[in-house]
A protein has these predicted regions:
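Ligand-binding loop in jelly-roll beta-barrel domains
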Residues: 70, 84-109
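Generic protein-terminus/edge-of-domain signal
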Residues: 1-72, 77, 88, 121-124
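An amphipathic alpha-helical interaction segment
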Residues: 106-112, 127-166
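Short, charged, solvent-exposed linker or helix-capping segments at domain edges/interfaces
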Residues: 44-45, 112-118
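N-terminal helical cap/lid subdomain that shapes the substrate entry/recognition surface
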Residues: 117-122, 139
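A general structural signal marking secondary-structure boundaries and capping sites
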Residues: 37-40, 61, 83, 144-148, ...
C-alpha cells in the first residue's frame, strides 16, 4: 500500500529508471531519485517496497516514522531507511517546508552496510558537514538519464560514497 500527498513546488524533480540485469548485479543501484521542495502538507506512507531510501535534508525538516522509531531529519542530516518495513515520512510538524534529496537504492552492498547504518534497525540520522552529499545527489540525478557502462559505474560509486558519508 502506498499513500501520499505530493505537496511540492514545481521545481521539484522526480526521476525513475528500470535497472538493467547488469545494474541489478552491482552492489549499489538506484530505481528512483529526486529533490523535493516539499511544502507543509507533503507526506508519504507505504507498507513495503523492495529497496532502501536515503534522505538528505537541505532546508527545513522532515519527520520519519518506522515502527516505534520517530526522528526529525533536520538541515544537513542524512538517514537510511529500509523500505521493506512499513514507514511514513512528511514535512515535520511546525515546519512549512522540507527541501530534501532522496534516492531509492538497493543491492548487496547496501544490505551488507545496513547493520552499520541502522544499528539495531533503529532510525539513526547522521549530521553531515560540507556539500559532498549534495554533489553526489546531483551527479546521481544527471547519470539517471544515461544507460551506459560509465553511468552504471558512476552511479554505483556515487551511492557507495553517499553511504560512506553516513
Amino acid at each position: 500500500m502506498l499513500t501520499y500527498n505530493m505537496d511540492v513546488t514545481p521545481e521539484s524533480v522526480w526521476k525513475r529508471t528500470t535497472p538493467s540485469e547488469a545494474e541489478l548485479a552491482q552492489p549499489y543501484y538506484c530505481t528512483e531519485a529526486g529533490v523535493f521542495y516539499a511544502q507543509q502538507h507533503f507526506s508519504t506512507a507505504r507498507t513495503d517496497k523492495e529497496s532502501y531510501i536515503l534522505f538528505y535534508t537541505l532546508r527545513g525538516a522532515g519527520l520519519i516514522e518506522q515502527g516505534e522509531s520517530h526522528v526529525v531529519l533536520s538541515t544537513g542530516q542524512a538517514l537510511l531507511l529500509n523500505c521493506r518495513t512499513p514507514q511514513s515520512y512528511c514535512t515535520a510538524p511546525g515546519q512549512d517546508h522540507w527541501h530534501h534529496y532522496w534516492v531509492h537504492l538497493d543491492g548487496a552492498g547496501v544490505a551488507a552496510m545496513e547493520p552499520l547504518l541502522l544499528p539495531g534497525k533503529k532510525l539513526t540520522p547522521v549530521q553531515l558537514t560540507g556539500v559532498k552529499m549534495q554533489e553526489y545527489f546531483e551527479m546521481l540525478l544527471g547519470q539517471m538519464e544515461h544507460s551506459t557502462v560509465d553511468s552504471m559505474v558512476t552511479t554505483g560509486l556515487a551511492l557507495h560514497e553517499m553511504l560512506a558519508l553516513c
